[in-house]
Amino acid sequence: MEPFALSKLHLTQYLFFTGKGGVGKTSTACAVATSLADSGKHVLLVSTDPASNLQDVFAMELHSKPTPITEVPGLSAANLDPIEAAAEYRESVIAPYRGVLPDAAIANMEEQLSGSCTIEIAAFNAFANFITDEAIQKSYDHIIFDTAPHRARTADAAAAVRME
């Protein structure tokens, strides 16, 4: 019997590791990402879990932008931070109006964009950017998503967006 080898599979550019918590999504995603990078592929590993452990696995600080993993050539990783994504989204909406509208109107806009719905929208936008950004698509052979337990349906939403 021949040993299992990822390099012999015809994998899509996007790989999703989903499921309930505690089943080994992060461990498996990291193992697959490392194996693909070791075989010469350029790989981006993205965690959409606010309680991500990627920084612990690779023993380095990670942010929302891809960071090369020094011990694994060809592998970069990112932690999608929903709070940071919400702040960036909020500012992108409000910035054009600063200095144009009164301060009270800006404060009202900030308040309106401070809820949990804004966080969800912003997190989804940040997630979708990893799929739709052409520079990211061209930079990596594979983009692997290590999802939060409650984000298991995000892949369904992404597939629906791509079908349009």
Regions found by a protein language model. Give the residues of each.
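Flexible phosphate-sensing "switch/lid" loops adjacent to ATP/NTP-binding sites
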Residues: 1-10, 15-16, 23, 28-164
